[in-house]
Amino acid sequence: MSESSISSSKPSVELPQATWSHLQRYPALSKFIKYAESLPPVERLISFNLVVLGSVNQWVSESSSSPRLVKQVVAAGKEGAFKLDELVNLLVFKEGVDGLLYNWKSHSNTPGIWLVWFFVDYVANISNTLLREFLIKPLHLQGSTASKEIGSSGEENKVTDASSLPHVAELSSTTRGMSQEIQSKVKSNYIDPTKDLAKEKYDAIVKPTTDKLQSVYIDPTKTKLNETYQRFTTVYENNLSKSESVPKAIVSTGLDLGNATIEKLKASREDQTNSKPAAVSTN
């Protein structure tokens, strides 16, 4: 299926051409394609497929009765197909097949260790390109400068010295820069705002509650406990110095503290009793 046959059969159908055009650059494959296209069954099959694609395209994309969402989905699918076609053309044929043939000729058609370096660099090249297309560009990251772009010409993508592993160095630079930029974006866009919001909520809600608990309950209770401990220690030491017996001092201390507590309760009750008539008389 040559470009002329596509355009003449169904001019309204736009198909990905990058990979197909590149395949015809190989002489043996180009001859086979032309021979296959000349066969009547293949020619009829191509024409039938083009007619079907043209009808579907006219009904879905160009018809006014087609829903807008369907048109958007079809347009996105077309864009993805062209992008995939260019990606396959770049990675498989330009960087893969053409690069291998170029290095094969530059090494006098002789295999050697350069094949290992070429394979390692080729894998790094694929990884680097996929990172750029599916991670760096969608996330709008800067990354490092690309040595090639999808859709660029094949000659400038040839690897002249595979042993230097240029794409391995490029992949290392890309991943390092991407990691640093992602960490920076996560910190500035998520961690810092979340930290500031949490501090604001703490100052507005939690801190007043903890301060109130501290001042109303914890500090007074702590003061009373210290006073009770000091009073117990003083009474115990006095009783111990008088009796010189630990058990007697403990018992005496308990009795003294109990009597002091009872006296305080009586005093508080008397104060409450005296305050009630005063409150009645005021009314």
Curated annotation (Swiss-Prot):
Keywords assigned: Acetylation, Lipid droplet, Membrane
UniProt-listed Pfam families: Perilipin_2
KW DNA damage (keyword) present: no
Cellular compartments per GO CC: lipid droplet; membrane
Modified residues (N-acetylserine): 2
GO biological process: aerobic respiration
Bilayer disposition of the protein: Peripheral membrane protein
Cell compartments where the protein resides: Lipid droplet; Membrane
Protein's UniProt keywords contain S-adenosyl-L-methionine: no
Coiled coil, from the record: none
Subcellular location, principal: other
UniProt miscellaneous comment: Present with 2157 molecules/cell in log phase SD medium.
Protein name in the entry: Protein PET10
Top-level taxonomy: Eukaryota, Fungi, Dikarya, Ascomycota, Saccharomycotina
